[in-house]
C-alpha cells in the first residue's frame, strides 16, 4: 500500500478521481435556493434540475472525443487541461447572473469531466499492471466515495450561507494543479508501464 501511495503520480490520479464526483451531486443542496433566486426565469424549475444532469450528458457525448484528444495531444496534458477547465467552468456559477448561462457552464463542466475521466483512466492503464492496478482501483473507489461524502456535506454547509457559494467547491481543482503538474509534466518523463517479471 505505502509503496503505491509513495508514487506521486498515483496520488495525483487519486486526486483527479476525487474531482469527478463533484460534477453532479455536489450542487444538489443548493438547487431549491437556486430555483428560488431565478423564480422569474421561464421554466426555472426545469432549468434548475438540468444543472445536475447536464454534465453527465456531456460526458457521454464527449468521452469518445476526449479519447481521441488524449491520443493526439497526450494524456497528461489533457488531464491538466481538463482539471483547469473543470475548475473554471464549475466555479463560474458563483458569478454568472443568468440561469441559462449557469446551465451553459454546466455543459462545459461536463466536457471537462470527460477530459479528466478519460485521461485519468488511460494513465492508470499506462502506469499500473496486474495486482498494482487492482490495488489502485480500490484506492480510487475509496477516494471517490470519500470525496463525494466530504464535498456534498461541505456543499450543504455552504448553501446555508449562500446557495452560490456551492460553486466555489469546484475551484479545488486549482489547488490540485501544481501537484498534478509536478507529478506528470515537470519531470519530463513519460509514464512507464509496470510489468511483471
Feature locations, PLM:
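Residue-level signature of mid-helix packing/kink "hotspots" within the transmembrane helices
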Residues: 25, 56-64, 148-149
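Conserved MFS/SLC helix-loop-helix module at the cytosolic interface between two early adjacent transmembrane helices
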Residues: 60-98
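Helix-loop-helix hairpin linking two adjacent transmembrane segments in secondary transporters
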Residues: 139-184
Amino acid at each position: 500500500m505505502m509503496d503505491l501511495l509513495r508514487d506521486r503520480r498515483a496520488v495525483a490520479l487519486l486526486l483527479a478521481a476525487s474531482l469527478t464526483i463533484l460534477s453532479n451531486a455536489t450542487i444538489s443542496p443548493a438547487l431549491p435556493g437556486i430555483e428560488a433566486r431565478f423564480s422569474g426565469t421561464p421554466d426555472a424549475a426545469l432549468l434548475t434540475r438540468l444543472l445536475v444532469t447536464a454534465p453527465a450528458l456531456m460526458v457521454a457525448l464527449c468521452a469518445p472525443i476526449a479519447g481521441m484528444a488524449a491520443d493526439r495531444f497526450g494524456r497528461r496534458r489533457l488531464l491538466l487541461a481538463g482539471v483547469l477547465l473543470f475548475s473554471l467552468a464549475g466555479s463560474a456559477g458563483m458569478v454568472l447572473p443568468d440561469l441559462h448561462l449557469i446551465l451553459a457552464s454546466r455543459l462545459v463542466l461536463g466536457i471537462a469531466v470527460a477530459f479528466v475521466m478519460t485521461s485519468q483512466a488511460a494513465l492508470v492503464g499506462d502506469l499500473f499492471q496486474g495486482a498494482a492496478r487492482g490495488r489502485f482501483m480500490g484506492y480510487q473507489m475509496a477516494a471517490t466515495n470519500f470525496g463525494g461524502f466530504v464535498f456534498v456535506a461541505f456543499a450543504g454547509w455552504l448553501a446555508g450561507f449562500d446557495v452560490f457559494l456551492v460553486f466555489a467547491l469546484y475551484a479545488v481543482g486549482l489547488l490540485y494543479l501544481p501537484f498534478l503538474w509536478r507529478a506528470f509534466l515537470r519531470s519530463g518523463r513519460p509514464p512507464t508501464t509496470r510489468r511483471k517479471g
